[in-house]
A protein has these predicted regions:
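Conserved anion-binding
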Residues: 28-29, 101-191
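Short acidic, glycine/proline-enriched helix-loop-strand junctions
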Residues: 91, 96, 142-143
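Conserved N-terminal beta1-alpha1 strand-loop-helix module at the mouth
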Residues: 1-64, 69-82, 86-93
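Conserved PLP phosphate-binding loop immediately N-terminal to the Schiff-base lysine helix
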Residues: 67, 71-73, 97-107
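Active-site flanking residues adjacent to catalytic metal/cofactor-binding acidic residues
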Residues: 25, 95-97, 124
Length: 191
């Protein structure tokens, strides 16, 4: 379990590895080697370990995407948990989960992700407001959230672009999330 605050861990990894690379760990069944699926009892963990072993000196962070593990059911969740545990302590872990609920539910996410899995940061969908961000920032000082502000998918313009003559939803998300982050000890970034 890492005791370093997220930002310090990230900056150290950037300096040591001379890298700003955050590598996604998103196992897609159709892209896994055929031998991984047919020969291994647990294809995800050996595959992820091989990637981590080959890249640990090249990255500053790993970003597993929760959805790619949930598609494998309980075995995928176990593989994700073991993958997170396998990542070297000096490399930041950003869980791409895009969670966004309120109060007790976000607090439960915080307990699971920050306390049990010890990820350093998590992506958050702020649509429900401050209640999606504050419980996570308050959970463990030094942990971080990345708030979705403007995404790159083609349909994003409809809601994230200019809705009127004003600045649009993305600008409002940035402004609001900056205020939410100022109220706690956590760190808040944007994607």
């Amino acid at each position: 379990m890492s005791q370093l605050p997220y930002l310090e861990k990230l900056r150290r990894a950037q300096a040591v590895n001379n890298s700003w690379l955050c590598l996604g760990l998103d196992p897609q069944p159709e892209l896994l080697p055929v031998e991984a699926i047919h020969k291994w009892d647990e294809p995800l963990l050996p595959f992820n370990r091989a990637i981590i072993d080959a890249t640990a000196d090249l990255v500053c962070a790993y970003k597993p995407n929760l959805g790619f593990y949930l598609q494998w059911g309980a075995a995928g969740v176990i593989a994700l948990e073991r993958t997170i545990a396998y990542i070297p302590d000096d490399i930041a872990i950003i869980l791409d989960a895009k969670i966004g609920d309120i109060g007790h539910t976000q607090a439960a996410w915080g307990r699971g992700l920050f306390d049990e899995w010890d990820v350093d940061a998590v992506t958050v969908n702020p649509y429900v407001g401050a209640e999606a961000v504050r419980p996570l920032l308050a959970r463990r000082p030094g942990k971080a959230v990345y708030v979705l502000a403007r995404t790159s998918n083609p349909g994003a313009q409809r809601f994230q672009g200019d809705l009127t003559a004003g600045a649009g939803l993305a600008a409002e998300v940035l402004r609001s999330a900056g205020q939410w982050a100022g109220a706690g000890d956590g760190h808040c970034g944007f994607v």
